[in-house]
Amino acid sequence: MLFLPADTGHPTGVAAASGPHVRSPVARAVRAMEPRCPPPCGCCERLVLNVAGLRFETRARTLGRFPDTLLGDPVRRSRFYDGARREYFFDRHRPSFDAVLYYYQSGGRLRRPAHVPLDVFLEEVSFYGLGAAALARLREDEGCAVPPERPLPRRAFARQLWLLFEFPESSQAARVLAVVSVLVILVSIVVFCLETLPDFRDDRDDPGLAPVAAATGPFLARLNGSSPMPGAPPRQPFNDPFFVVETLCICWFSFELLVRLVACPSKAVFFKNVMNLIDFVAILPYFVALGTELARQRGVGQPAMSLAILRVIRLVRVFRIFKLSRHSKGLQILGQTLRASMRELGLLIFFLFIGVVLFSSAVYFAEVDRVDTHFTSIPESFWWAVVTMTTVGYGDMAPVTVGGKIVGSLCAIAGVLTISLPVPVIVSNFSYFYHRETEGEEAGMYSHVDTQPCGTLEGKANGGLVDSEVPELLPPLWPPAGKHMVTEV
């Protein structure tokens, strides 16, 4: 019979007509599908599996249900046969083998024992070669991210460029380029903010501010090309220091985007990537603004239309901050959390919309008799309802009647309850993605397929294996640092 550890949670043993696993419907269905053969038969032979001193016993036909695995293939498992003891010996993790054997007995149900760490169990599953499908199901059940396959270009030069600009962890030069890219992004954002200061702002694009400039000080006298200081030459747009810095940043962004576009393995996949679209949007405002400025200097186009375009384009420049998400795991986790919580966020907005309509209507009718009321209509009350339900409370609009104050109190309480309902789900999603990312980093997992070759094996004469007997195991789960590769396309 089979010797089991006392704390095991999986039914294991001989595939006979007794035992707890036979009473389960799954086990009976699996046994009903097995072919009946008269004894003596090799498939009914009992096999003894010794795992680090703990002996398991099962039938050969039980292991034969999965012939592509290490235990299911008689040729591959024969390498571990001990003729003197008439058993198969595996110097592996004993608590994990209980679940591995149950995988064969149950017809493909793989469950990690509660007392076995995930990384240890994944390594055992890889050793016994249970297959990529079983490993993917296990990762999904455990909440692990399935590493996607990241293709590489075929040409060697394009492959080096792609690794240099797309994978900062691939080499020291790639890390330096990533640092330079982050610094350029930060400089661009700082310039975008500083050029809106009154001391640096050039308002000559807006003729409507000319009277204000004459009355408020010299810094607004830049309008229509006039000098901010008496006697100083008119300020030209292309001589502006902010324009020069912005041009240098755009040159770097354009160079980076162009190199990645040329070296990418698939143009279609490249343009479907959201981060690449953000990179394109980050440089588009500069060229539109430059073309508008040149057209205005040549007298082409309407000034009002040019001014409207410039204002919209300048607003789009703020999206450059999302370029940092390419180099920030925290921003990526935040994006994954928001994407996974779209349903909860939609419910939150829907609940707030209902509350805003109800309480704005109630406070309007409660304050309608007041002559000096701020709640002149229900749409005017929307703003008050929003800031009250979100517990902001600016105080620019406040009820003064008893009924209005009661409505305001109920609105604040309802807002707290409404906002607090979906928050635990969003926090749970963030915790899930955060721990998944940190656990992947601690385990040394990479987001691409490893192709590290196997070590040199000794010959059969020394008790080893020849190359043809190497088991077709899954790729290593935790490749050594500096040895990660990706699949070529």
From Swiss-Prot:
Membrane topology field: Multi-pass membrane protein
Assembly information from the UniProt record: Heterotetramer of potassium channel proteins.
GO MF terms, alphabetically ordered: voltage-gated potassium channel activity
Disulfide feature: none
Name of the gene: Kcna7
Gene Ontology process terms (BP): protein homooligomerization
Keyword field contains Ion transport: yes
Organism this protein belongs to: Mus musculus (Mouse)
Domain writeup: The N-terminus may be important in determining the rate of inactivation of the channel while the tail may play a role in modulation of channel activity and/or targeting of the channel to specific subcellular compartments. The segment S4 is probably the voltage-sensor and is characterized by a series of positively charged amino acids at every third position.
Listed InterPro entries: BTB/POZ_dom, Ion_trans_dom, K_chnl_volt-dep_Kv, K_chnl_volt-dep_Kv1, KCNA7_BTB_POZ, SKP1/BTB/POZ_sf, T1-type_BTB, VG_K_chnl
Organ and tissue specificity: Detected in heart, skeletal muscle, brain, and pancreatic islet cells.
Family of the protein in this entry: Belongs to the potassium channel family. A (Shaker) (TC 1.A.1.2) subfamily. Kv1.7/KCNA7 sub-subfamily.
Keywords: Glycoprotein, Ion channel, Ion transport, Lipoprotein, Membrane, Palmitate, Potassium, Potassium channel, Potassium transport, Transmembrane, Transmembrane helix, Transport, Voltage-gated channel
Motif Selectivity filter: positions: 391-396
Lipid attachment site numbers (S-palmitoyl cysteine): 264
Residue ranges crossing the lipid bilayer per the database entry: 176-196, 242-262, 274-294, 309-328, 345-365, 406-426
GO CC terms: voltage-gated potassium channel complex
Glycosylation sites: 224
Protein name in UniProt: Potassium voltage-gated channel subfamily A member 7
Catalyses which reaction(s): K(+)(in) = K(+)(out)
Functional description taken from the UniProt entry: Mediates the voltage-dependent potassium ion permeability of excitable membranes. Assuming opened or closed conformations in response to the voltage difference across the membrane, the protein forms a potassium-selective channel through which potassium ions may pass in accordance with their electrochemical gradient. Channels formed by isoform 1 inactivate faster than channels formed by isoform 2.
